[in-house]
C-alpha cells in the first residue's frame, strides 16, 4: 500500500510538471489560460495610474500571435518573458485592436525581441499610430503634462509629509511613496525616450489569419470607442478579444468615442457566440451579461440626452441634470465617493457631451 501511495504521488508530480500552468503571475501582471494555447495577460496600472490594456496570446502550430502591446515597453518586455515561460515558439504577429497608446506603446519590445515580427492594424488606425510618433514626445515633454504634474504633486506631498487634505503620512506610507516616486521617475524617463513603432501590415474591414489549423478572425467595426475598433475572434474556441469596445475598469472609457455608432456595434457584439471574452481593460468575461449592461447604458444615455435636446436644454443644462445612477448599481461596483467623481465625469460630463454631439450630427 505504501508503494502504491508513493507511486501515485510520483505520478501526480510528473503530471504537474508536464501540464502548462493555468495562471502565472509576476510583480504587476497575471497571465491566465483561457483556452487550449490561448492566454490573457491582465496588468496592474502603471505607477502614474495610467492603465495598461489587456494582452492576448494565441499559440499556433509553429508561431504565436499577440494582441495589443500595453502602455510601457518595460511591461511589454515582462509580458514577453511570461510568453516565453509557456512556449519556445516565436511571436510572428502582433495585432492592435485600436490606436490608443495604452495598447501599443510597448511594440518596440516585441520588435527588439522578434525582429521579423508582422505588426498588424486596421488601415486608418495605422495612420493614427503614426501620429503618436509625431506628437507623443511633445506631449510627454510638456511641463504641464499629466505625467509631469502628477509626479510633481507626489513629490510635494512627500516633502510636506502630508497629502492635500492634511492627512499626515505614516513611516510605512513614506517608504511606499519613496519607492513609488523612484518608479514614477523611471517610467517617465522611459516615456520620454519612447520609440513608437508603426504597423507594417494593414487591412480593411476584415482579415483572417491561420496559425496552422487555428483560425483567427479580425473584424473592424468602425466607430465605437475609437475611429476604428477591431475585435479578434477565435471561432473554434469561441474566444473574443473585444478591445476597448468593452472596458470594465471600472466603467467604460468614453472619451473621444462615438456613442450613436457605438450602440449598434454593441448589439452586434452581443450576437457573437462566446465561451470567453477578454475586454480591453478589466476582468475576463464568460458571457454577454456585461455587454448587455454597457449597451443598456448607451441606450439610456442617448435616449435621455435626445429627450433633453428636444426640450431645448443646452449641453451644460443636460450635464447638470441628467441622472443615470440607476444603471451602475451592482455592475460597476463603484464607491459612493467614486460615484461623485469618476462616474460623474466619465458619464455625466464626457459621455453626455459625446452623445450630444453625435445626436446633433457634430461628430463625436
Q: Where are the regions a protein language model picked out?
A:
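Core dinuclear metal-dependent hydrolase active-site scaffold
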Residues: 33, 177-180, 192-198, 202-234
Amino acid at each position: 500500500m505504501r508503494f502504491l501511495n508513493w507511486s501515485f504521488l510520483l505520478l501526480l508530480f510528473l503530471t504537474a510538471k508536464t501540464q502548462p500552468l493555468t495562471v502565472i503571475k509576476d510583480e504587476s501582471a497575471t497571465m491566465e489560460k483561457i483556452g487550449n494555447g490561448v492566454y490573457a495577460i491582465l496588468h496592474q496600472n502603471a505607477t502614474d495610474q495610467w492603465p495598461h490594456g489587456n494582452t492576448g496570446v494565441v499559440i499556433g502550430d509553429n508561431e504565436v500571435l499577440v494582441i495589443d502591446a500595453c502602455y510601457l515597453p518595460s511591461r511589454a518586455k515582462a509580458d514577453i518573458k511570461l510568453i516565453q515561460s509557456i512556449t519556445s515558439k516565436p511571436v510572428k504577429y502582433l495585432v492592435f485592436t485600436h490606436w490608443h497608446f495604452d495598447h501599443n506603446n510597448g511594440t518596440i519590445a516585441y520588435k527588439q525581441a522578434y525582429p521579423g515580427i508582422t505588426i498588424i492594424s486596421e488601415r486608418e488606425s495605422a495612420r493614427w499610430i503614426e501620429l503618436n510618433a509625431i506628437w507623443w514626445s511633445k506631449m510627454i515633454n510638456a511641463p504641464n503634462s499629466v505625467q509631469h504634474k502628477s509626479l510633481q504633486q507626489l513629490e510635494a506631498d512627500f516633502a510636506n509629509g502630508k497629502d492635500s487634505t492634511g492627512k499626515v503620512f505614516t513611516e510605512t506610507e513614506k517608504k511606499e511613496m519613496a519607492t513609488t516616486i523612484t518608479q514614477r521617475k523611471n517610467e517617465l524617463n522611459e516615456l520620454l525616450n519612447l520609440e513608437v513603432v508603426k504597423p507594417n501590415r494593414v487591412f480593411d474591414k476584415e482579415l483572417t489569419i491561420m496559425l496552422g489549423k487555428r483560425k483567427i478572425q479580425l473584424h473592424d467595426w468602425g466607430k465605437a470607442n475609437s475611429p476604428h475598433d477591431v475585435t479578434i475572434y477565435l471561432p473554434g474556441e469561441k474566444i473574443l478579444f473585444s478591445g476597448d469596445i468593452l472596458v470594465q475598469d471600472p466603467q467604460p472609457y468614453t472619451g473621444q468615442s462615438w456613442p450613436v455608432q457605438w450602440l449598434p456595434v454593441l448589439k452586434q457584439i452581443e450576437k457573437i457566440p462566446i465561451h470567453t471574452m477578454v475586454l480591453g481593460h478589466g476582468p475576463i468575461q464568460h458571457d454577454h451579461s456585461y455587454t448587455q449592461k454597457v449597451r443598456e447604458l448607451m441606450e439610456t444615455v442617448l435616449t435621455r440626452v435626445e429627450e433633453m435636446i428636444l426640450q431645448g436644454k443646452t449641453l451644460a443644462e443636460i450635464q447638470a441634470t441628467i441622472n443615470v445612477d440607476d444603471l451602475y448599481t451592482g455592475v460597476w461596483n463603484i464607491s459612493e465617493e467614486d460615484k461623485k467623481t469618476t462616474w460623474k465625469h466619465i458619464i455625466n460630463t464626457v459621455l453626455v457631451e459625446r452623445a450630444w454631439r453625435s445626436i446633433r450630427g457634430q461628430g463625436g
